[in-house]
Amino acid sequence: MFDRKKIEEGVRLILEGIGEDVERPGIKDTPIRIARMFEEIFRGLLPPDEDLLKSIEGETHDEMVLIKDIPFYSVCEHHLLPFFGNAHIAYIPDGRIVGLSELPKALDYLSKRPQVQERLTSQLANLLMEKLKPKGCMVVIEAEHLCMSMRGIKKPDAKTITSAVRGIFRKSQTTRQEALELINRRDK
């Protein structure tokens, strides 16, 4: 569980540390707001409300399933600044499929914690392999990191792309290429 009081105290200390008047009307309730926000954006640190990636057994579909351009946000664990973008998730079933909303739900759960994009990408692919036992999967995540956009090197709009490739997507260049072409295809 989250310790809301400890979060509020910490935020108050940070505000004092940067020279803010913690009793100023616009700032006074900020520690409470931040504590509530942390409970929401870090929900993935708690056990999931439901079983992730509930599968439907006995399906005979054995061709690629791809959901692309799934928007997400997360928080970089190094600077506690957001990173956000789109995920693309492909898998080839082996007797099990999931309802299409299950993949974005899994992404949302795993992204709601202090995180790095590389780990998020791998965690999603590993979860897919563990729960669905598909012939293979591929996860590609494209994201902008505010820790690069608004501080440090200050390069807004720079995108970081990570991938995790498992099973047949790793073994077969043709399968991997098909997924990449579908991900990169833009409807006119």
Curated annotation (Swiss-Prot):
Signal peptide: none annotated. It holds the Pfam family GTP_cyclohydroI. Keywords: GTP-binding, Hydrolase, Metal-binding, Nucleotide-binding, One-carbon metabolism, Zinc. It catalyses: GTP + H2O = 7,8-dihydroneopterin 3'-triphosphate + formate + H(+). Its EC number is 3.5.4.16. PROSITE patterns: GTP_CYCLOHYDROL_1_1 (PS00859), GTP_CYCLOHYDROL_1_2 (PS00860). GO terms for molecular function: GTP binding; GTP cyclohydrolase I activity; zinc ion binding. Zn(2+) binds at residues 76, 79, 147. One of its GO terms (biological process) is tetrahydrofolate biosynthetic process. Pathway: Cofactor biosynthesis; 7,8-dihydroneopterin triphosphate biosynthesis; 7,8-dihydroneopterin triphosphate from GTP: step 1/1. It comes from the Bacteria. One of its GO terms (cellular component) is cytoplasm. Belongs to the GTP cyclohydrolase I family. Homomer. This is GTP cyclohydrolase 1. The gene is folE.
